[in-house]
Amino acid sequence: METDLNDYTVIKEGEAEVLMHKKNQVFFNKAQVNNRDMSIAVLRAFIIKRKQEHEAMLSKRARSSGKVVEKDVSETSKEETPTENGDDNGKTNGEHEVTTQDGPKEAAKTAYESARRELKPPRVLEALSASGLRALRYAREVEGIGQVVALDNDPASVEACQRNIKFNGLMSTSKVESHLTDARVHMLSHPKDFDVVDLDPYGAPSIFLDSAVQSVADGGLLMCTATDMAVLCGANGEVCYSKYGSYPLKGKYCHEMALRILLASIESHANRYKRYIVPVLSVQMDFYVRVFVRVYTSASAMKNTPLKLSYVYQCIGCDSFHLQSVGRSLPKNNSVRYLPGVGPVVPQDCTHCGKKYNMGGPIWSAPIHDQEWVNSILNGVKSMKDRYPAYDRICAVLTTISEELPDVPLFLSLHSLSATLKCTSPSAALFRSAVINAKYRVSGSHVNPLGIKTDAPMEIIWDIMRCWVKNHPIKPQSPEHPGSVILSKEPSHQADFSRHVGSLSKAQAKKVARFLPNPEKHWGPKIRAGRTITSKHVSLLGHEAVNGHLNNNHKEAGDEEEEEEEEEPEEDIIEGEPELKRQKTTEDFASTS
């Protein structure tokens, strides 16, 4: 495969390098470095965890084998009775002594060594590879990884991926292979064949989920990204329901709800094949959500799925929300009986402001993180700081996640509560102190710097806000306004705003950065590969973003002459570019009328 390097720009990320054509032929988004770094961190933790689980299984199997051999030997010894012949008796006893001492050890050692050879390096499937950068980084940066299979149904992408595999040398060519095929067909034809399946599509992953949950090996890792955030956050609820089987709500917690909708959808697909998922990490970053789940097979454990799903009732007036479980369980003798959930958990009208409720879901209401995994991933990232290009960002996200309440779905927004009452907002530290002093738990959220997770009921939350307003009076509002209705009631709980030591998390107390700004302008989604650039893209993204996306205009890669050549042919790069004019304002129209 002959390649004219003058037509390409070399992009280096981590230990991998890829050749990107100066035309928009193959999709690449620099902003996804956060996604790729987080995936590598989780993959490293998965390989370590997988090895630990295998060692534990071997140890258990070895002990079991030893006990079986000892039992057989003891039974054999009892069956053989001693004879009157002293020589024969001594000879027989001596033989049995050797067997009793050495037999179990040898059998256990043999079983251990035999099982040890069964653990092979994990096979990874990147279902939608595009340039192959992610697959190359997996192969070059993750120790102990096996074969990496990169798929794409676009010939230009597969050609680019194969070119990049060769460009990265022998290590990549020996581990990474690229195929032109439909990812869904490939996954369906390889059931339980991959230890890791990575889905990172352009848009919704819904059409790949059914085949993905079948392709993951038992105990394997499924990594899935969804970038259709407008759909998942309630802009088109009917579209979200058709894709994911859940109805979204427009709340301040909509991005976390998007995570939980995606998890519920994956669980639904897995249940059809007597499988279930265990989330280890769920992240909302930049313009997408990303979940990491392990997939297991168990018909009995699958029955617990309704206990992990809930409907959400959200008041249209004050944004109070309540969760109702889809199912419940009752212990019955030595078994468990599964029953429908009891509801509704709310009346027709909100008890706080008198407005109606919107109902959404079902969503995943069980924990979306495994705190042991999160701490392991975070420690691994800190120990390999130089190997993560986006170290600061992923470390900040993981730090915030490690301090979240794992068993509290969704969160409150302090500014939203204050906006409902039209009052000044208390500081986060004061509000958290009031919640803790009321004997409830509270934490932040990695999704929103203003988000507050707590197990306190909404009655306590509004009582705290009523007490705050009493000390910080506001102007009278319309009696029909939700805030006026809430404030018309006397608080049943007197809030204590004295500062509590737990009002600040450990990261906050140490002043560790938790929410970082974007590193550069236009840090977000990019134009789909091969799409014609129109005036709409220019107006939305700007000339700098569009041209930078197409040309991969990195000044450090070229000299001054190349920079001048890149500035000239804007007409060739952007088709249908409009003449730049200042849009008329209302003052202009008034002056011409």
Curated annotation (Swiss-Prot):
Q: Which residues bind S-adenosyl-L-methionine?
A: R36, R134, D152, V185
Give all residue intervals belonging to the Trm1 methyltransferase domain.
9-465
Which GO-annotated molecular functions does the record name? tRNA (guanine(26)-N2)-dimethyltransferase activity; tRNA binding
EC number, as in UniProt: 2.1.1.216
Q: Which residues cross the membrane?
A: none
Query: What spans are recorded as compositionally biased (Basic and acidic residues)?
Result: 68-81, 88-118, 578-587
Provide the reaction this enzyme catalyses. Answer: guanosine(26) in tRNA + 2 S-adenosyl-L-methionine = N(2)-dimethylguanosine(26) in tRNA + 2 S-adenosyl-L-homocysteine + 2 H(+)
**EC class:** transferase
What is the recorded function of this protein according to its Swiss-Prot or TrEMBL entry? Answer: Dimethylates a single guanine residue at position 26 of most tRNAs using S-adenosyl-L-methionine as donor of the methyl groups.
Which family, according to UniProt?
Belongs to the class I-like SAM-binding methyltransferase superfamily. Trm1 family.
- Under what name is this protein listed? tRNA (guanine(26)-N(2))-dimethyltransferase 1
Q: Which organism is it from?
A: Arabidopsis thaliana (Mouse-ear cress)
